[in-house]
Amino acid sequence: MAELPIAPVDRLIRKAGAERVSEDAAKVLAEYLEEYAIELSKKAVDFARHAGRKTVKAEDIKLAIKA
């Protein structure tokens, strides 16, 4: 089960053009987004550690997105 709140995910889907969004659809997207964010965060942590830092910075996230 995703830790992300469903309401913001619902709003994202509506922002993409949906008139109505089922709760299941929002939950599935929330789960996917959470998995993606965790994988991206792991890469960012690796970049921070490689730079000799314990703190993950925006630049680490940007590098992880490009990697």
Swiss-Prot record:
InterPro entries in alphabetical order = Archaeal_histone_HMF, CBFA_NFYB_domain, Histone-fold, HmfB-like
From the UniProt entry, list the residue stretches annotated as the region Interaction with DNA: 20-22, 54-57
What triggers or suppresses the expression of this protein? After 17 hours growth at 85 degrees Celsius HTkB/HpkB is expressed about twice as abundantly as HTkA/HpkA (at protein level).
**Cellular component, GO annotation:** chromosome; cytoplasm
On whether Nucleotide-binding is a keyword of this UniProt record, the answer is no
Arranged from A to Z, the UniProt key words for this protein are: Chromosome, Competence, Cytoplasm, DNA condensation, DNA-binding
Q: Which GO terms describe its molecular function?
A: DNA binding; protein heterodimerization activity
Annotated effect of mutating residue 17 to D/L/S: Expected to impair oligomerization. Alters compaction of DNA on nucleosome-like structures. Delays adaptation to a sulfur-free medium due to impaired transcriptional activation of genes required for growth on a sulfur-free medium
Q: What else is known?
A: In a chromatin histone fraction 12% of the protein is this histone. Cells have about 2.5 x 10(6) histone proteins per cell, enough to coat all DNA with a ratio of >1 histone dimer for 30 bp of DNA, cells are polyploid with 7-19 genomes per cell.
Query: What name does this protein carry?
Result: Archaeal histone HTkA
Q: Which organism is it from?
A: Thermococcus kodakarensis (strain ATCC BAA-918 / JCM 12380 / KOD1) (Pyrococcus kodakaraensis (strain KOD1))
UniProt lists the gene as htkA
